[in-house]
Amino acid sequence: MHSTMSVQHGLVALVLIGCLAHPWHVEACSSRTVPKPRSSISSSMSGTALPPTQAPVTSSTTMRTTTTTTPRPNITFPTYKCPETFDAWYCLNDAHCFAVKIADLPVYSCECAIGFMGQRCEYKEIDNTYLPKRPRPMLEKASIASGAMCALVFMLFVCLAFYLRFEQRAAKKAYELEQELQQEYDDDDGQCECCRNRCCPDGQEPVILERKLPYHMRLEHALMSFAIRRSNKL
């Protein structure tokens, strides 16, 4: 009898220690019956009962404030072509010059080429070295103009040399032609047509025979005479 009581007390002590060590099994260890929750009036009227573990749902309204951001207006300015002085000398390193009018005043800017930066595109983007140099279009225009001037001066010298050579040859040929004509006139002076082989009768006037030169020789003689007179005037 005493041994059975001690065994019962030991079992009770083990059960209590187990319940204290695992509190989530206290409900299972309890010998009381858990009362079932009563159904609400609405559920009893509708005939459907809520589950015992379902918590009451509370509706809450949240106010959200939405902020709208207005985009910035896209303002564009009309661009104009720079004057010739600015277009040739203002922008550097093959940059493009353009102007923008603000309050009726032109503001000049440069559109830099790839690899350059700065107000006048005078800096490199890598090491910021200063490279002021004249734009290539200006140098190309200067070279073309100088080449055209050299060609024009050369043509003038060639034309002048040909003119002087022609004048010299014309003067020489005109002088030789004049000498030949003078010699022919001296040989035929005092002779008449009727008495080349015999003397003229008394009272007959001698007729001087004028020898006419061919047409091409007369034309050449006229040109040479004109050239001589023109050279004497100069």
UniProtKB/Swiss-Prot annotation:
Region of interest called Disordered, as start-end residue ranges on this chain: 33-71
Glycan-bearing residues: 74
Disulfide bonds: 82-97, 91-110, 112-121
Cytoplasmic domain ranges by topology: 165-234
Cellular compartments annotated: Cell membrane; Endoplasmic reticulum membrane; Golgi apparatus membrane
Signal peptide range in chain numbering: 1-28
Principal location class: membrane
Biased composition (Low complexity): 56-71
Topology with respect to the bilayer: Single-pass type I membrane protein
Any one Gene Ontology molecular-function term assigned to this protein's record: transmembrane receptor protein tyrosine kinase activator activity
Keyword entries, A-Z: Cell membrane, Developmental protein, Differentiation, Disulfide bond, EGF-like domain, Endoplasmic reticulum, Glycoprotein, Golgi apparatus, Membrane, Neurogenesis, Signal, Transmembrane, Transmembrane helix
Any GO BP annotation: epidermal growth factor receptor signaling pathway
Post-translational modification: Proteolytic processing by Rhomboid occurs in the Golgi. Cleavage takes place within the transmembrane domain close to residue 144 and the active growth factor is released. N-glycosylated and O-glycosylated.
InterPro entries to which the protein is assigned, alphabetical: EGF-like_dom, Gurken/Spitz
Stored PANTHER family: KEREN-RELATED
Biological role: Ligand for the EGF receptor (Gurken). Involved in a number of unrelated developmental choices, for example, dorsal-ventral axis formation, glial migration, sensory organ determination, and muscle development. It is required for photoreceptor determination.
Subunit structure: Interacts with Star via the lumenal domain.
Annotated protein name in UniProt: Protein spitz
Organism field: Drosophila melanogaster
Lineage of the organism: Eukaryota, Metazoa, Ecdysozoa, Arthropoda, Hexapoda
